[in-house]
Amino acid sequence: MALPLRTARHASRLAQTIGRRGYATAEPDLKSALKAVIPAKRELLAEVKKQGDEVIGEVKVSNVIGGMRGLKSMLWEGSVLDADEGIRFHGKTIKDCQKELPKGPTGTEMLPEAMFWLLLTGEVPSTSQVRAFSKQLAEESHLPDHILDLAKSFPKHMHPMTQISIITAALNTESKFAKLYEKGINKADYWEPTFDDAISLLAKIPRVAALVFRPNEIDVVGRQKLDPAQDWSYNFAELLGKGGANNADFHDLLRLYLALHGDHEGGNVSAHATHLVGSALSDPFLSYSAGLLGLAGPLHGLAAQEVLRWILAMQEKIGTKFTDEDVRAYLWDTLKSGRVVPGYGHGVLRKPDPRFQALMDFAATRKDVLANPVFQLVKKNSEIAPGVLTEHGKTKNPHPNVDAASGVLFYHYGFQQPLYYTVTFGVSRALGPLVQLIWDRALGLPIERPKSINLLGLKK
């Protein structure tokens, strides 16, 4: 969008005000920190609206029949995904976030709740602010009895993603937004109950995931006390039955995984579905339930488990004392059979995924991971597969993505139920879409309603 010079300068100053790194001296809580930045963001939106007739791109037939790939058509505040640079969160790279965001009371990895704060406000919170936020999440994690009864009613063969989506939707009995909207609330105030619902869901979703993971212990999980002095990921691990000091590395992996997967721009299925349903003023519980159903699709959220299955099959075929040629031959066998190599390529990225590198850096500091033959296959594949895929010639990005490592790392730490990896992804992905739902309401964004066209219309 080409803004006039004066307007562009003004918008730039506003953006700097909104996105600057700041440590507030009064140590406001998250809602207060958000409230402080809303006026500037609204002013920026008002400036941008004046340029409503400006052209920001063109729509090609390939965009329409190709899943709208590459088409800039929605507002998303928390992150920007560049094809070459990868993901940035309010301008910060993953390495920036790992360096700047507060860590847990134990462990060395950035906290996903600190990432949520950054996504929502554009500011890096202090350690004390994050500790207070972690405490709030622990205190708001309780589930009503009807949710426990609902979880007990599920048939044993119901897919875990179906379960977590149903429970998330059913939690809208707790929605402050739905209740206040029914009574009547000023549109300018929509963001406050939306914020409250988003925090409530963020607090509850680890326990919901644990209900799905431990279906024979519904009452135990439903009433398990969380440690208010610990962080969101630590308490999630406790709910999964993997607490304690002996699982410290798993806790750090979970922190890193949840932070890395929290937001990846708005065009992916889970984020877009949440935004779409939320644009109809559905509450955050209903909206994110829709996002979870999108995440359940094999083209979106099932990649980590597919990578693990493929790697384990590869190990069974070539053993643990493999050569580079063994790996190369298995890759070619996969491609020649008409299958894809799981964990490689990306819908937007054209360079190596920095999230994959973050997980590999994590592994590089753990001798037990490096010694694991399954992980060694992951590492060797990352060295050989790009060349094979380039020679094959049918991919725009031959590099590994985050899924190439995440499932295998979970497997190493004893989390060996691949069907539940997407559920964990669903806990993480709540971060970004819930942030955007809050901003959708704070900015008064309208219902989403694109225009469709049929094939004959395109042919003309």
From Swiss-Prot:
Which GO MF terms are attached to this record? 2-methylcitrate synthase activity; citrate (Si)-synthase activity
Q: Which residues bind CoA?
A: 69, 187, 299, 341, 343-344, 395-396, 401
Q: Which UniProt keywords apply?
A: Mitochondrion, Transferase, Transit peptide
Per annotation, the relation between temperature and activity is:
Optimum temperature is 45-52 degrees Celsius.
Give the protein's biological function: Catalyzes the synthesis of (2S,3S)-2-methylcitrate from propionyl-CoA and oxaloacetate and also from acetyl-CoA and oxaloacetate with a greater efficiency. Also has citrate synthase activity and can substitute for the loss of citA activity.
Protein's recorded name: 2-methylcitrate synthase, mitochondrial
Gene inactivation phenotype reads: Blocks propionyl-CoA utilization, as well as growth on propionate. Impairs production of several polyketides such as sterigmatocystin.
Which Gene Ontology BP annotations are present? carbohydrate metabolic process; propionate catabolic process, 2-methylcitrate cycle; propionate metabolic process, methylcitrate cycle; sterigmatocystin biosynthetic process; tricarboxylic acid cycle
Write down the EC number.
2.3.3.5, 2.3.3.16
What does the subunit comment say?
Homodimer.
Q: Which family does it belong to?
A: Belongs to the citrate synthase family.
Q: What is the protein's species of origin? A: Emericella nidulans (strain FGSC A4 / ATCC 38163 / CBS 112.46 / NRRL 194 / M139) (Aspergillus nidulans)
